Regions:
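N-terminal glycine-/serine-/threonine-rich beta1-alpha1-beta2 phosphate-ribose binding loop
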Residues: 1-119
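Predominant activation on well-ordered alpha-helical scaffold segments within soluble catalytic domains
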Residues: 33, 56, 120, 142-146, ...
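General beta-strand structural signal in soluble alpha/beta enzymes
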Residues: 89-91, 106-107, 131-132, 155-158, ...
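Glycine-enriched alpha-helix->loop->beta-strand junction motifs that scaffold or abut catalytic
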Residues: 101, 126-128
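Rossmann-fold NAD(P)-binding glycine/threonine-rich loop
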Residues: 109-125, 132-154, 158-161
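Core active-site phosphate/anionic-ligand binding loop and the adjoining beta-turn-alpha structural block
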Residues: 142, 149-204
């Protein structure tokens, strides 16, 4: 993450962008769209979501003009719209993983099966993956990482959410010589040392 601001600024100055495709326009997805809209050198260009209205709202909250937002149902429609500088919405996840201008697919649905399917399609189509879907990552993340490595693409979690934040803390503690014996839950949930799957089932 060091010097990412400089790298993105250089991309912007050379009139280039990292094109992002987002799957899932819920709370985390909307946050991604809004945050990226404030950054140089990156752009969320296409969103796949079950509800097109939610995806529209994500772009509108980020300051995109309504007339610049188009719905696409086919690969050719999506690519033509993006080449014309439009922001694309679709209900078809596969479009996000196939559309040529997209460099990176961000998975933010929170649904295990959808996350796995999205990552597999991204790998098959040579797209890098940022997995915000901790449910998928905890279930099949190591397998997806191995497949992505074999395909020569990046599979990664994200900074900011609890799993990424815990990993950053672990890496720092390990680097400065601490013997880390355990990592655990972040501050958002109460610590229950006696928790079992049965006692947490209703909360989950």
């Amino acid at each position: 993450m060091l010097n990412i601001n400089t790298a993105l600024r250089r991309l912007h100055e050379s009139r280039k962008q990292i094109k992002l495709g987002l799957v899932g326009a819920g709370q985390m997805g909307k946050g991604i769209v809004t945050q990226v809209s404030q950054m140089k050198g990156m752009s969320v260009s296409i969103i796949a979501n079950r509800s097109i209205d939610k995806a529209v709202q994500a772009f509108l909250l980020a300051g995109v003009d309504r007339e610049d937002i188009l719905v696409a149902n086919t690969l050719s429609e999506a690519e033509q719209a993006m080449k014309g500088g439009k922001y694309v919405l679709t209900e078809d996840i596969e479009l996000v993983t196939k559309v040529a201008p997209v460099d990176v697919v961000i998975e933010a649905t929170g649904v295990t099966e959808i996350g796995a399917q999205t990552a597999l399609k991204a790998i098959y189509n040579g797209k890098h993956i940022v997995m915000l879907n901790v449910e998928t990552d905890a279930t099949v993340g190591p397998l997806l990482k191995k497949m992505a490595d074999g395909a020569g693409i990046v599979y990664t979690g994200s900074a900011g959410d609890e799993p990424g934040a815990i990993k950053e803390l672990y890496d720092f503690a390990d680097a400065v010589g601490f013997d880390v014996i355990a990592v655990g839950k972040g501050k958002n949930n109460p610590l229950d040392r006696d928790a079992t799957p049965d006692t947490l089932r209703d909360q989950a």
